[in-house]
Amino acid sequence: NLIDVLFYHYSNNEDEDVSFDTVIIDEAARVAPMDLLVAMVLAKRRIILVGDHRQLPHMVDEEVIKKSDLSENEYINESIFGYLKKRAKKLETYDNIKRAITLNNQYRTHPMLGKFVSDNFYKKHGESFDSPLGTTIGKVEDYFNQRLEGIENTPAIWLDVSNKECKEQRAWSRKCEAQKIVEYLKKWIFSKEGEDLTFGIITFYRNQVNLINNLIKEQFTKEERDIINRRLSDGSERLRVGTVDSFQGMEFDIVFLSIVRSRDIKTISDKLKDYNLFGFLVSKNRLCVSMSRQKKSLIVVGDKE
Protein backbone atom coordinates (compact mmCIF):
# COMPACT_ATOMS: atom_id res chain seq x y z
CA ASN A 1 0.00 0.00 0.00
CA LEU A 2 1.09 3.57 -0.71
CA ILE A 3 0.11 6.45 1.56
CA ASP A 4 0.88 10.00 0.46
CA VAL A 5 0.50 12.66 3.14
CA LEU A 6 1.66 16.16 3.90
CA PHE A 7 4.74 16.12 6.09
CA TYR A 8 3.16 17.86 9.08
CA HIS A 9 0.26 15.40 9.31
CA TYR A 10 2.34 13.03 11.41
CA SER A 11 4.67 15.54 13.03
CA ASN A 12 1.63 17.23 14.61
CA ASN A 13 -0.38 14.12 15.49
CA GLU A 14 0.99 12.66 18.71
CA ASP A 15 -1.91 10.24 19.24
CA GLU A 16 -1.60 8.31 15.99
CA ASP A 17 0.45 5.13 16.37
CA VAL A 18 1.61 4.35 12.85
CA SER A 19 4.66 3.00 11.05
CA PHE A 20 5.67 2.04 7.51
CA ASP A 21 8.11 -0.41 5.98
CA THR A 22 9.59 2.37 3.85
CA VAL A 23 9.37 6.13 4.36
CA ILE A 24 10.24 8.44 1.43
CA ILE A 25 10.75 12.10 2.35
CA ASP A 26 10.82 14.63 -0.50
CA GLU A 27 12.61 18.01 -0.20
CA ALA A 28 14.38 16.53 2.82
CA ALA A 29 17.10 19.20 2.82
CA ARG A 30 14.50 21.88 3.58
CA VAL A 31 13.03 20.16 6.63
CA ALA A 32 14.07 21.36 10.09
CA PRO A 33 16.15 18.73 11.96
CA MET A 34 13.59 17.82 14.64
CA ASP A 35 10.74 17.59 12.12
CA LEU A 36 12.80 15.36 9.84
CA LEU A 37 13.54 12.98 12.72
CA VAL A 38 9.80 12.71 13.50
CA ALA A 39 9.17 11.43 9.97
CA MET A 40 12.22 9.15 9.93
CA VAL A 41 11.20 7.22 13.06
CA LEU A 42 8.03 6.06 11.25
CA ALA A 43 10.15 3.74 9.07
CA LYS A 44 10.57 0.09 10.12
CA ARG A 45 12.97 -1.06 7.37
CA ARG A 46 14.06 1.72 5.04
CA ILE A 47 14.34 5.51 4.86
CA ILE A 48 14.75 7.27 1.51
CA LEU A 49 15.63 10.97 1.67
CA VAL A 50 15.25 12.97 -1.55
CA GLY A 51 16.63 16.48 -1.77
CA ASP A 52 19.44 18.86 -2.65
CA HIS A 53 21.44 20.41 0.17
CA ARG A 54 23.10 22.78 -2.32
CA GLN A 55 19.74 24.52 -2.57
CA LEU A 56 17.56 26.09 0.12
CA PRO A 57 18.10 24.82 3.67
CA HIS A 58 15.56 24.82 6.49
CA MET A 59 14.48 28.28 7.60
CA VAL A 60 16.45 30.24 10.20
CA ASP A 61 15.43 33.70 11.41
CA GLU A 62 17.63 36.35 9.75
CA GLU A 63 17.92 38.25 13.05
CA VAL A 64 19.40 35.14 14.68
CA ILE A 65 22.02 34.95 11.92
CA LYS A 66 22.98 38.60 12.35
CA LYS A 67 23.42 38.25 16.12
CA SER A 68 25.54 35.10 15.87
CA ASP A 69 29.31 35.02 15.43
CA LEU A 70 28.97 32.66 12.48
CA SER A 71 28.61 33.62 8.84
CA GLU A 72 25.27 32.95 7.15
CA ASN A 73 26.69 30.01 5.24
CA GLU A 74 28.26 28.38 8.28
CA TYR A 75 25.12 28.85 10.29
CA ILE A 76 22.39 27.40 8.08
CA ASN A 77 23.92 25.49 5.19
CA GLU A 78 24.47 22.28 7.15
CA SER A 79 21.18 20.40 7.06
CA ILE A 80 20.48 16.98 8.56
CA PHE A 81 20.12 15.77 4.97
CA GLY A 82 23.62 17.00 4.09
CA TYR A 83 25.07 15.53 7.28
CA LEU A 84 23.48 12.11 6.68
CA LYS A 85 24.67 12.09 3.08
CA LYS A 86 28.26 12.66 4.24
CA ARG A 87 27.88 9.86 6.80
CA ALA A 88 26.46 7.52 4.15
CA LYS A 89 29.38 8.24 1.80
CA LYS A 90 31.83 7.57 4.62
CA LEU A 91 30.18 4.24 5.43
CA GLU A 92 30.54 3.23 1.78
CA THR A 93 34.33 3.36 2.18
CA TYR A 94 34.09 0.68 4.89
CA ASP A 95 31.58 -1.82 3.48
CA ASN A 96 31.18 -0.85 -0.23
CA ILE A 97 27.39 -0.69 0.16
CA LYS A 98 26.05 2.22 -1.89
CA ARG A 99 23.76 4.38 0.20
CA ALA A 100 23.87 7.76 -1.60
CA ILE A 101 22.96 8.42 -5.23
CA THR A 102 23.53 11.76 -6.98
CA LEU A 103 21.66 12.46 -10.22
CA ASN A 104 24.06 13.53 -12.95
CA ASN A 105 21.79 14.99 -15.66
CA GLN A 106 19.49 18.03 -15.74
CA TYR A 107 16.75 18.53 -18.31
CA ARG A 108 15.33 21.93 -17.32
CA THR A 109 17.57 24.72 -18.46
CA HIS A 110 19.64 25.76 -21.48
CA PRO A 111 22.93 23.77 -21.51
CA MET A 112 25.03 26.94 -21.16
CA LEU A 113 23.16 27.88 -17.98
CA GLY A 114 23.18 24.29 -16.79
CA LYS A 115 26.97 24.22 -17.10
CA PHE A 116 27.24 27.51 -15.20
CA VAL A 117 25.21 26.15 -12.28
CA SER A 118 27.08 22.84 -12.32
CA ASP A 119 30.52 24.48 -12.40
CA ASN A 120 29.81 27.11 -9.74
CA PHE A 121 27.70 25.24 -7.20
CA TYR A 122 28.28 21.50 -7.61
CA LYS A 123 31.58 20.70 -9.33
CA LYS A 124 33.89 21.40 -6.38
CA HIS A 125 31.84 18.95 -4.31
CA GLY A 126 32.23 16.20 -6.91
CA GLU A 127 28.56 16.54 -7.90
CA SER A 128 28.77 18.11 -11.38
CA PHE A 129 26.08 17.20 -13.90
CA ASP A 130 25.51 17.23 -17.65
CA SER A 131 22.80 18.89 -19.75
CA PRO A 132 21.81 16.38 -22.47
CA LEU A 133 19.07 18.47 -24.15
CA GLY A 134 20.67 20.45 -26.94
CA THR A 135 24.03 18.68 -26.59
CA THR A 136 23.77 14.89 -26.84
CA ILE A 137 19.99 14.93 -27.44
CA GLY A 138 18.86 17.08 -30.37
CA LYS A 139 19.80 20.70 -31.00
CA VAL A 140 19.54 23.67 -28.64
CA GLU A 141 16.83 25.30 -30.78
CA ASP A 142 14.70 22.15 -30.48
CA TYR A 143 14.20 22.78 -26.76
CA PHE A 144 15.20 26.33 -25.83
CA ASN A 145 14.07 28.48 -28.75
CA GLN A 146 12.50 31.86 -27.90
CA ARG A 147 12.04 34.92 -30.12
CA LEU A 148 11.47 37.75 -27.64
CA GLU A 149 12.46 41.08 -29.18
CA GLY A 150 16.01 42.08 -28.29
CA ILE A 151 17.01 38.81 -26.60
CA GLU A 152 16.20 36.25 -29.30
CA ASN A 153 17.63 32.86 -28.27
CA THR A 154 19.96 34.49 -25.72
CA PRO A 155 20.17 32.33 -22.57
CA ALA A 156 21.86 34.83 -20.23
CA ILE A 157 21.38 38.61 -20.06
CA TRP A 158 22.67 41.21 -17.61
CA LEU A 159 20.35 44.22 -17.48
CA ASP A 160 22.48 46.93 -15.90
CA VAL A 161 20.84 49.46 -13.56
CA SER A 162 23.64 51.58 -12.15
CA ASN A 163 23.93 53.07 -8.69
CA LYS A 164 23.73 56.50 -10.35
CA GLU A 165 20.14 55.81 -11.41
CA CYS A 166 19.03 54.94 -7.89
CA LYS A 167 20.48 53.49 -4.71
CA GLU A 168 19.20 50.55 -2.69
CA GLN A 169 16.74 51.53 0.01
CA ARG A 170 17.16 50.72 3.69
CA ALA A 171 14.15 48.41 3.50
CA TRP A 172 15.94 46.33 0.81
CA SER A 173 14.11 47.50 -2.28
CA ARG A 174 15.29 49.28 -5.41
CA LYS A 175 12.66 51.05 -7.48
CA CYS A 176 14.69 51.53 -10.67
CA GLU A 177 15.24 47.76 -10.90
CA ALA A 178 11.56 47.09 -10.34
CA GLN A 179 10.58 49.65 -13.00
CA LYS A 180 12.99 48.17 -15.53
CA ILE A 181 11.65 44.66 -14.94
CA VAL A 182 8.01 45.73 -15.26
CA GLU A 183 8.84 47.67 -18.44
CA TYR A 184 10.35 44.62 -20.16
CA LEU A 185 7.73 42.26 -18.74
CA LYS A 186 4.92 44.31 -20.29
CA LYS A 187 6.78 44.49 -23.60
CA TRP A 188 7.33 40.72 -23.81
CA ILE A 189 4.47 38.95 -22.04
CA PHE A 190 1.81 40.47 -24.34
CA SER A 191 3.83 40.06 -27.55
CA LYS A 192 3.08 37.34 -30.08
CA GLU A 193 6.46 35.79 -29.29
CA GLY A 194 5.71 35.72 -25.56
CA GLU A 195 2.05 34.69 -25.49
CA ASP A 196 2.85 31.02 -24.76
CA LEU A 197 5.82 31.63 -22.45
CA THR A 198 5.86 31.61 -18.66
CA PHE A 199 7.63 34.36 -16.70
CA GLY A 200 9.12 34.37 -13.22
CA ILE A 201 10.42 37.37 -11.27
CA ILE A 202 12.71 36.41 -8.40
CA THR A 203 14.27 38.61 -5.76
CA PHE A 204 15.87 38.08 -2.37
CA TYR A 205 13.68 40.55 -0.48
CA ARG A 206 9.96 40.74 0.34
CA ASN A 207 9.88 44.55 0.00
CA GLN A 208 11.13 44.26 -3.59
CA VAL A 209 8.38 41.72 -4.30
CA ASN A 210 5.79 44.16 -2.95
CA LEU A 211 7.26 47.00 -5.01
CA ILE A 212 7.14 44.99 -8.25
CA ASN A 213 3.57 43.82 -7.58
CA ASN A 214 2.48 47.40 -6.90
CA LEU A 215 4.04 48.60 -10.17
CA ILE A 216 2.26 45.84 -12.08
CA LYS A 217 -1.02 46.87 -10.49
CA GLU A 218 -0.38 50.53 -11.39
CA GLN A 219 0.91 50.05 -14.95
CA PHE A 220 -1.17 47.10 -16.20
CA THR A 221 -4.87 47.46 -16.98
CA LYS A 222 -7.34 45.14 -15.27
CA GLU A 223 -7.71 43.21 -18.54
CA GLU A 224 -3.94 42.80 -18.77
CA ARG A 225 -3.73 41.62 -15.16
CA ASP A 226 -6.49 39.11 -15.84
CA ILE A 227 -4.53 37.76 -18.81
CA ILE A 228 -1.31 37.25 -16.87
CA ASN A 229 -3.20 35.66 -13.97
CA ARG A 230 -4.66 32.97 -16.23
CA ARG A 231 -2.89 29.65 -16.49
CA LEU A 232 -1.73 28.20 -19.79
CA SER A 233 -3.44 25.15 -21.31
CA ASP A 234 -1.00 22.83 -19.51
CA GLY A 235 -1.80 24.41 -16.14
CA SER A 236 1.40 26.48 -15.91
CA GLU A 237 1.39 29.91 -14.26
CA ARG A 238 1.88 32.77 -16.72
CA LEU A 239 3.61 34.90 -14.12
CA ARG A 240 4.94 34.48 -10.60
CA VAL A 241 6.60 37.21 -8.52
CA GLY A 242 8.26 36.16 -5.29
CA THR A 243 11.29 35.65 -3.11
CA VAL A 244 13.76 32.85 -3.80
CA ASP A 245 12.10 30.69 -1.15
CA SER A 246 8.82 30.60 -3.09
CA PHE A 247 10.57 29.38 -6.27
CA GLN A 248 12.28 26.19 -5.06
CA GLY A 249 11.18 23.27 -7.22
CA MET A 250 9.59 25.58 -9.82
CA GLU A 251 10.52 26.47 -13.39
CA PHE A 252 9.62 29.20 -15.89
CA ASP A 253 10.61 29.87 -19.50
CA ILE A 254 11.92 33.37 -18.76
CA VAL A 255 13.22 34.45 -15.34
CA PHE A 256 14.11 37.95 -14.12
CA LEU A 257 16.44 38.02 -11.10
CA SER A 258 16.38 41.34 -9.20
CA ILE A 259 19.60 41.74 -7.17
CA VAL A 260 18.59 44.92 -5.22
CA ARG A 261 21.92 45.32 -3.36
CA SER A 262 24.07 48.09 -4.87
CA ARG A 263 27.34 49.01 -3.16
CA ASP A 264 30.68 50.30 -4.45
CA ILE A 265 32.80 47.13 -4.46
CA LYS A 266 36.04 49.14 -4.48
CA THR A 267 35.30 50.51 -1.02
CA ILE A 268 34.24 47.24 0.61
CA SER A 269 36.08 44.46 -1.20
CA ASP A 270 37.87 43.48 2.01
CA LYS A 271 34.47 42.78 3.56
CA LEU A 272 32.96 40.95 0.63
CA LYS A 273 31.80 38.03 2.79
CA ASP A 274 30.22 40.21 5.46
CA TYR A 275 26.59 39.11 5.80
CA ASN A 276 25.43 42.51 7.04
CA LEU A 277 26.69 44.15 3.82
CA PHE A 278 25.46 41.63 1.25
CA GLY A 279 22.83 39.56 3.04
CA PHE A 280 21.43 36.70 0.98
CA LEU A 281 23.83 37.48 -1.89
CA VAL A 282 26.54 35.57 0.00
CA SER A 283 24.28 32.53 0.40
CA LYS A 284 25.36 30.05 -2.27
CA ASN A 285 22.21 28.02 -1.61
CA ARG A 286 19.94 30.93 -2.52
CA LEU A 287 22.09 31.91 -5.49
CA CYS A 288 21.93 28.31 -6.73
CA VAL A 289 18.12 28.26 -6.60
CA SER A 290 17.69 31.74 -8.06
CA MET A 291 19.94 30.99 -11.04
CA SER A 292 18.46 27.61 -11.94
CA ARG A 293 14.69 28.27 -12.30
CA GLN A 294 14.76 29.33 -15.97
CA LYS A 295 14.31 27.08 -18.98
CA LYS A 296 15.14 29.42 -21.87
CA SER A 297 16.57 32.72 -20.55
CA LEU A 298 17.83 34.22 -17.29
CA ILE A 299 17.79 38.03 -17.07
CA VAL A 300 19.77 39.37 -14.11
CA VAL A 301 18.86 42.94 -13.19
CA GLY A 302 21.29 44.90 -11.04
CA ASP A 303 24.28 47.19 -10.70
CA LYS A 304 27.31 45.59 -12.38
CA GLU A 305 29.70 47.95 -10.59
Where do the language-model regions lie?
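Conserved helicase motor core of SF1/SF2 NTP-dependent helicases
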Residues: 2-305
